[in-house]
């Protein structure tokens, strides 16, 4: 199997280095990752500027672009051979619930799905400085082995969150749904050395929907959460209501 690996923390991040090392023992891998941290880039593509790609060594590239740029370039002509699937990560921190809307890690996996490949986004869910990357990398290998035995459909995206624990403390796997958070904390207002006002995006909101069955709950209890996600954002259950509502619009 041939795997494309990307991330949003940058090509030198510990997570992607460990992921490539572990997956490289069981598959052929190519790493194409941003040259710097692009956390929170979501699905953004670079459209107004050229994108420079710098080979570092065979099958390893740093890209002056977003995580989505990396996967898009790789799968639309930069690589001579098409990979079989995409792995994105290992992210330094969780991508639980609403986090997936902003995550460059998840976006890289989504771009793989857009371009016809099954994809896995994997994150190490702990503090702002997680340490057990080898645990998450071993989880990735386990998932790849299962995929090889029982392949995923091409439209599959798995969002995987691994507790920041030693391998022998992981309780197993749970298939989960996305939970959600409360509204984000207020923006942080400060002043620069010249007295000008500057702003920082505040912390994410606390857990709201985080009960049994959610990704939050699984990780909190020591399980690896595996959430199938999709790119169709249509709220199908609301279509009839909107049709009826539109009947009241005068033309």
Swiss-Prot record:
Pfam families in UniProt: SurE
Substrates-to-products reaction catalysed: a ribonucleoside 5'-phosphate + H2O = a ribonucleoside + phosphate
EC number: 3.1.3.5
Molecular function via GO: 3'-nucleotidase activity; 5'-nucleotidase activity; exopolyphosphatase activity; metal ion binding; nucleotide binding
Keyword Magnesium recorded: no
Gene3D superfamilies reported for this sequence: Survival protein SurE-like phosphatase/nucleotidase (3.40.1210.10)
Gene Ontology cellular component list: cytoplasm
Sorted UniProt keywords: Cytoplasm, Hydrolase, Metal-binding, Nucleotide-binding
Sequence intervals crossing the membrane: none
CC cofactor: a divalent metal cation
Localization per Swiss-Prot or TrEMBL: Cytoplasm
Enzyme class label: hydrolase
Main location: cytoplasm
Cofactor remark from the record: Binds 1 divalent metal cation per subunit.
Binding site for a divalent metal cation: 8-9, 39, 91
Listed NCBIfam families: PRK00346.1-3 (NF001489), PRK00346.1-4 (NF001490), surE (TIGR00087)
Function of the protein: Nucleotidase that shows phosphatase activity on nucleoside 5'-monophosphates.
Family: Belongs to the SurE nucleotidase family.
HAMAP family cross-referenced by the UniProt entry: SurE (MF_00060)
Protein name: 5'-nucleotidase SurE
Originating organism: Halorhodospira halophila (strain DSM 244 / SL1)
């Amino acid at each position: 199997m041939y795997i494309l690996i990307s991330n949003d923390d940058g090509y030198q991040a510990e997570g992607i280095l460990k992921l490539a090392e572990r997956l490289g023992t069981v598959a052929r891998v190519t790493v194409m990752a941003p040259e710097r941290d692009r956390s929170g880039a979501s699905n953004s593509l670079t459209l107004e500027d050229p994108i420079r790609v710098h080979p570092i060594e065979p099958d390893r590239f740093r890209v002056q672009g977003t995580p989505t740029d990396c996967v898009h370039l790789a799968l639309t002509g930069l690589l001579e051979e098409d990979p079989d699937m995409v792995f994105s990560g290992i992210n330094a921190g969780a991508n639980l619930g609403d986090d997936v809307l902003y995550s460059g890690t998840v976006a890289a996996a989504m771009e793989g799905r857009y371009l016809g490949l099954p994809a896995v986004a994997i994150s190490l869910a702990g503090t702002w400085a997680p340490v057990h990357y080898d645990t998450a990398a071993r989880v990735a290998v386990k998932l790849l082995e299962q995929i090889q035995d029982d392949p995923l459909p091409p439209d599959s995206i798995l969002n995987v969150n691994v507790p920041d624990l030693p391998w022998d403390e992981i309780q197993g796997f749970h298939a989960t749904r996305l939970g959600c958070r409360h509204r984000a904390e207020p923006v942080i207002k400060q002043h620069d050395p010249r007295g000008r006002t500057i702003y920082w995006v505040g912390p994410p909101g606390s857990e709201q929907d985080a009960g049994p069955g959610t990704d939050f709950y699984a990780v909190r209890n020591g399980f690896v959460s595996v959430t199938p996600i999709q790119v169709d954002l249509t709220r199908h259950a609301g279509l009839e209501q909107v049709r009826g509502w539109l009947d009241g619009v005068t033309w």
